[in-house]
Amino acid sequence: MAPKTLYEKIFDSHLVHEEADGTCLIYIDRHLVHEVTSPQAFEGLRNANRKVRRTDCTLATVDHNIPTASRKSYRDTKSFVEQVDSRTQCMTLEENVKAFGLTFFGLSDNRQGIVHIIGPEQGFTLPGATIVCGDSHTSTHGAFGALAFGIGTSEVEHVLATQTLLQKRAKNMLIQVDGELSQGVTSKDIILHIIGLIGTAGGTGHVIEYAGSTIRSLSMEARMSICNMSIEAGARAGLIAPDEITYEYIKGRPLAPKQGEAWDQALAYWKTLPSDEGAQYDTVIKIDAKDIPPTVTWGTSPQDVVAITGTVPDPKNASNEAEAKAWTRALEYMGLEAGTPMEKIKIDKVFIGSCTNARIEDLRAAARVLHGRKVADGLYCMLVPGSGLVKKQAEAEGLDKIFQAAGFDWREAGCSMCLGMNPDQLAPGERCASTSNRNFEGRQGAGGRTHLMSPAMAAACAVTGYLTDVRKVVGHSSAKVGSDAAKPAFEIEVSDAKSYLVDATPAPAPTNVAAAGAGALTDEDALRDVPASHISSSGGGMEKFTTLTGIAAPLERSNVDTDLIIPKQFLKTIKRTGLGSALFWPLRYDAKTGEPDPAFVLNQKPYDQSKILVVTGPNFGCGSSREHAAWSLLDFGIRAVIAESFGDIFRNNLTKNGQLPVVLSRAQIQRLTQDAKAGKQITVDLVDQLVITADGKEKFSFETPEFTRHCLINGLDDIALTLQRDAQIGAFERNRSTHTPWLDGFGYHANSNSSSLLDSAKPLVNNVTATDW
């Protein structure tokens, strides 16, 4: 047998069926659900009268748009969440987990938190598992040697209904980091350095495996930070082979295999997962750890990185014209001048949190810097723990007192200012030192300016009020800021995170899902008086795509992220429709007046009637998993997008909505752009897989996977197609229960495709049972 990579072992072991064109149906072991990308998926289940196949393998929480203000007076979601649209999503999730019988960590539960923090925390994340969530940073879980990736809402529905996904095999990329890290360099610096090296499209079509002595020396929390940002490098997922550090982290957690025979069986399997000697990788990148400096972003893409000791780059030094234009645009947005030393850049806010850096080790690192120091005058700083249990542990260790004494706002768990879907946002023009994962335009608030960095560096910035080399605040730098001579020693009594965990219990029994009926209103719809005609339909197929002829709008831009396609404020919907007016909001509308900008192409005739979008740059649709981006294009009328390359999740989201992503060469796109700029119609023929110029003289061929092509041409519902393979899925599940029984949830009966539920749940903390509504 040929040697295999870690990725290949996991993928092959989860294969249920493979089509002739290489489209694979793989089984999903773990599904994390949150309030933003799930409403339409549950609605689709209702409309098709489908249930959740594996409630025992599904875990739900609220995190993206919840307030992080104090919950001391919390009574219920309806009274606590003030923003109407956020409240609607949160209450809709509460309604759905009740109806479908899912384990749910709500706002009064200490276990609530960011999905990618609570999964590992509870032992829900395990080596060798396939893990998905309607969030692009699901790659975080790859730190455990799991194949974890983000999916769109249509795929969320697919997993809920079938516990499987349709996937194509990815390429293998190995990034090997060896040597000892320099002082002040952390895992966040490692991943920012990697993204700066390969670019935000460098990993497109790949799964990255991180290896080398540097990676092996890292803690699990540090490894999670690296895998978390694999999506920022364009990769489908990021993986680190499990080892003794992994096993020790997992052992004893509520949803991990229990000590004894179950643990020994799982451990023996996990030890077979690392890549075989001689396994082949499509791309190999080697990095010397000593070449990685404390790193910070300067622009509006995660690839816009520089050493904290460096300067803002000059577009004159860009490698090509497109890059020079991108740098110029980024400098204008960020309000920076080329050549400015990074440490001369003044900041307005500091945010320590997010699924990248809101774990207990991150908080300890920041507290070590802040201990005995004060936040600079005029600066607002906030610390948002990644979960209620992280918050509880930090308070037990006295970290909250250190942050508050320094002048930080100590918050409750949630995604917070990472994407600003809740009230935690930057005002226009405000500059933030942030431990989050994306610095896109408007990511933390319209007009906000984000610099990504490690928790320790963010804490150092809080002390000085400027972007700051952390080594000047703590460490051995000769240019040290302040003095440690009069400061008391930083001493905390480090506690064991596992001591804050509680026993897990089975998922609750579902209520009467069928009573909702196809197209019926949920209780939340009735509460908001939403007309039945406004509830979107799903699960019933899509419009056929054969040949499309129409106006093509030219978009001359590279690395168009999903935040730019549709900003976060429009994600607070429980519908799939009505988003066309939000498409390219930051580009289509004047930021001050809100009026349409006549300079933007879609506001001009005939492009306001465009059916096709021609993008001149690569990596269109990079960033988050929000299917709202595809929905907004469709609602506007655009059914085909032509570009050099696409973000992997976005490309999938298009096809799930009857839209076609077309990959052509740069030269071919330049030719089509000529027709587009002239307002001429072009043709996209999926049947013959051709794009035809306006005069009909030039035809450019493209490739679409045959199964995807078949579904698009015939307007097929791929969930219904997958359910035709129910017998194969059931056989896979029975085999899974035999060979990897630790992946089955409590009380699962292999021949029933449903959880067997206990009559009563075991009491947990704060009188909270298995699920908190």
Curated annotation (Swiss-Prot):
Matches recorded under InterPro entries: 3-IsopropMal_deHydase_lsu (IPR004430), 3-IsopropMal_deHydase_ssu (IPR004431), 3-IsopropMal_deHydtase_ssu/lsu (IPR012235), Acnase/IPM_dHydase_lsu_aba_1/3 (IPR015931), Acoase/IPM_deHydtase_lsu_aba (IPR001030), Aconitase/3IPM_dehydase_swvl (IPR015928), Aconitase_4Fe-4S_BS (IPR018136), Aconitase_4Fe-4S_dom (IPR036008)
GO MF terms held by the record: 3-isopropylmalate dehydratase activity; 4 iron, 4 sulfur cluster binding; metal ion binding
SUPFAM superfamilies hit by this protein: Aconitase iron-sulfur domain (SSF53732), LeuD/IlvD-like (SSF52016)
EC id: 4.2.1.33
Domain of life: Eukaryota
Cofactor stoichiometry and binding remark: Binds 1 [4Fe-4S] cluster per subunit.
Binding site for [4Fe-4S] cluster: C355, C415, C418
Pathway annotation: Amino-acid biosynthesis; L-leucine biosynthesis; L-leucine from 3-methyl-2-oxobutanoate: step 2/4
Needed cofactors: [4Fe-4S] cluster
Key words, A-Z: 4Fe-4S, Amino-acid biosynthesis, Branched-chain amino acid biosynthesis, Iron, Iron-sulfur, Leucine biosynthesis, Lyase, Metal-binding
GO cellular-component term (any): 3-isopropylmalate dehydratase complex
Catalytic activity: (2R,3S)-3-isopropylmalate = (2S)-2-isopropylmalate
PROSITE patterns referenced in this protein's UniProt entry, alphabetically: ACONITASE_1, ACONITASE_2
Biological process, per Gene Ontology: L-leucine biosynthetic process
Subunit structure: Monomer.
Family from the record: Belongs to the aconitase/IPM isomerase family.
Function: Catalyzes the isomerization between 2-isopropylmalate and 3-isopropylmalate, via the formation of 2-isopropylmaleate.
Protein name as catalogued: 3-isopropylmalate dehydratase
UniProt lineage: Eukaryota, Fungi, Dikarya, Basidiomycota, Ustilaginomycotina
